[in-house]
């Protein structure tokens, strides 16, 4: 196997974050690392940093989820949706993804990994707003916060939450979304940093409550 496609070894922190679910997480990482590039799910630079940049980055969000139904918008390869479903078997997940080949991958992995808490929907978020009612919604690397608000809020129950993974500019995105925040009645909007002191690349989340 060419060196640039070798899959990163799991970091020690993975075991503490996944607990008894570690074998399932390890199998998912193996599947994604060995087949993801070929299937067009991840780029050629990603296998060597699969754990640190993607899987750990995603699972750090798990403690923010509450028992109930969580939707993941634009799940893609399963980041963070499948990772969170592995870590939180007590939570039900709806993975919303419009691309057929990605949906096929997600459905295959749900069956392969034995995840009975996951439903996969081939759709865009705006197409299922009248069909589902979520307690929380997640998304990673989908769009700016201001654009995600009108896509995600209609999916969430009153009192539910947006839990959106963001980069280093999360605070600026919140500032830029002030009009959308007011229009869609979001409250308690905050940026949460996860993994500080534990990992090299922290995870930033914008969390907001739907009033």
UniProtKB/Swiss-Prot annotation:
Binding-site residues for S-adenosyl-L-methionine, renumbered to this chain: 74, 79, 125-126, 140
Subcellular location: Cytoplasm
A UniProt-annotated Pfam family: GidB
GO molecular function terms noted in the UniProt entry: rRNA (guanine-N7-)-methyltransferase activity
InterPro entries: rRNA_ssu_MeTfrase_G, SAM-dependent_MTases_sf
Positions of transmembrane segments: none
Main location: cytoplasm
Phosphoprotein listed as a keyword: no
Domain of life: Bacteria
EC number: 2.1.1.-
Enzyme class, UniProt record, top EC level: transferase
GO cellular component: cytosol
The keyword Repeat appears for this protein: no
Keywords carried by this UniProt record: Cytoplasm, Methyltransferase, rRNA processing, S-adenosyl-L-methionine, Transferase
Family: Belongs to the methyltransferase superfamily. RNA methyltransferase RsmG family.
Matches recorded under NCBIfam families: rsmG_gidB
HAMAP family linked: 16SrRNA_methyltr_G (MF_00074)
Role: Specifically methylates the N7 position of guanine in position 518 of 16S rRNA.
Protein name: Ribosomal RNA small subunit methyltransferase G
Encoding gene (name): rsmG
């Amino acid at each position: 196997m060419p060196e640039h496609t070798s899959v990163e070894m799991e970091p020690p922190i993975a075991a503490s974050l996944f607990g008894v679910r570690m074998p399932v997480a390890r199998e998912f990482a193996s599947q994604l690392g060995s087949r993801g590039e070929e299937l067009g799910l991840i780029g050629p630079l990603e296998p060597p940093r699969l754990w640190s940049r993607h899987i750990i980055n995603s699972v750090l969000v798990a403690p923010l989820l509450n028992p109930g139904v969580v939707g993941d918008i634009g799940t893609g390869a399963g980041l963070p949706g499948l990772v969170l479903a592995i870590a939180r078997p007590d939570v039900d997940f709806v993975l919303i993804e419009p691309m057929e080949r990605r949906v096929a991958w997600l459905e295959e992995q749900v069956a392969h990994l034995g995840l009975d808490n996951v439903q996969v929907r081939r759709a865009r978020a705006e197409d299922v707003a009248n069909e589902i009612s979520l307690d929380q919604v997640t998304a990673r690397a989908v769009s700016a916060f201001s654009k995600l608000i009108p896509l995600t809020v209609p999916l969430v129950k009153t009192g539910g939450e947006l839990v959106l993974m963001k980069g280093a500019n999360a605070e600026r995105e919140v500032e830029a979304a002030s009009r959308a925040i007011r229009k869609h009645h979001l409250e308690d909007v905050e940026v949460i940093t996860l993994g500080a002191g534990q990992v090299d690349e922290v995870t930033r989340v914008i969390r907001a409550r739907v009033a």
